Amino acid sequence: MEDGLLEIMTKDGGDMPAPLEVSTVPAVGDVISGEYNGGMKELMEHLKAQLQALFEDVRAMRGALDEQASHIQVLSDDVCANQRAIVSMCQIMTTAPRQGGLGVVGGKGSFQSDPQEPETPSPGIGDSGLLGRDPEDEEEEEEEKEMPSPATPSSHCERPESPCAGLLGGDGPLVEPLDMPDITLLQLEGEASL
């Protein structure tokens, strides 16, 4: 049939028709694969950029953590030094009162360590001449003078000439020892033993 058409056309004196150009249409699969490949390429580049930024952030955080770790180490060393200083101070504080306590205990036994007022005889105590004499001589003289007689009471404190007559007020206690000189205390203890 085509040969017949060609013969008719040539008989009429017409030119030979040019061959028809067929346009090539890409297949659907090729289009989809191209778009997929292009999208995946862009996605991979985007992910690569994000990972690179994440790595940079991790490096920065690691540097900051290293700096903080060194700072924490310095603080730990300071804390350990302060703890050792506190322990040594506690040891000094626990041992110092014991040494000072011996002196305090030893000082309590004598009236010399306590602050005293000037040794003046109390009113009512007839021992104005005791301070200028030897305590042992005074005790011997008092014992000779105040020997009890059969007709007199045995208590020396009831006699008006006794030095302790002014110290007793009925059944009341003696004068506080801190207000009296040591010689007077020895005098009173000797008379009480008699």
From Swiss-Prot:
UniProt GO cellular component terms: cytoplasm
Coiled-coil ranges (or none): 39-68
Keyword Coiled coil: yes
Keyword NADP in annotation: no
Region (Disordered): 101-176
Residue spans of biased composition, Acidic residues class: 135-145
Signal peptide: none
Pfam families: DUF4677
Keywords: Coiled coil
The name this protein goes by in its record: Coiled-coil domain-containing protein 184
Lineage, broadest ranks: Eukaryota, Metazoa, Chordata, Craniata, Vertebrata
Name of the gene: CCDC184
